[in-house]
Amino acid sequence: MTDIEIYRKRLERIEELLLELSEYSKKGAVIIVEGKRDILSMKRLGIDGNFELATRHSLFNFSERIAKLGCEVIILTDWDRRGDILATKLSEYFGNFGIKPELQIRNKLRLITQKEIKDVESLYTYVSKLRSKTGVSFDQEDNI
């Protein structure tokens, strides 16, 4: 498999995950991220939705408030040590409130990008780089 084929496959898998994330968002799910730049990256990738910053509150109170909304919860923290700890704690707290948060999108993004990037805010730049290397323009893929 050539480098371009590898990049194309990686881009395809990321685009599928972004489409899945977009679908969750359209259904009213709350997407939990760590910072404002994460939100900006997601919006630049075509994901509009209800974003919440997990790092601005007591995690217990934050989880309780989100759980009371009664909607699906997607944890999209960074895939560094801090993001892993935050995802684990949030998942535990949400579990205490009877909510099973979606973690698979985060985990799959982590696997696909593990040696390249470690955070959500870099995702837009990474996808742009993959699109450039594979010759896929944003116009061709902006159906998210």
From Swiss-Prot:
One of its GO terms (molecular function) is metal ion binding. The keyword Metal-binding applies. Binds two Mg(2+) per subunit. Pfam families: Toprim. PROSITE patterns: TOPRIM (PS50880). Its cofactor is Mg(2+). InterPro entries: TOPRIM_dom, TOPRIM_RNase_M5-like, UPF0292. Residues 28-109 form the Toprim domain. Mg(2+) 1 binds at E34, D78. The keyword Magnesium applies. Mg(2+) 2 binds at D78, D80. It comes from the Archaea. Keywords: Magnesium, Metal-binding. Belongs to the UPF0292 family. NCBIfam families: PRK04017.1-2 (NF003091). This is UPF0292 protein MA_4098. The lineage of its organism: Archaea, Methanobacteriati, Methanobacteriota, Stenosarchaea group, Methanomicrobia.
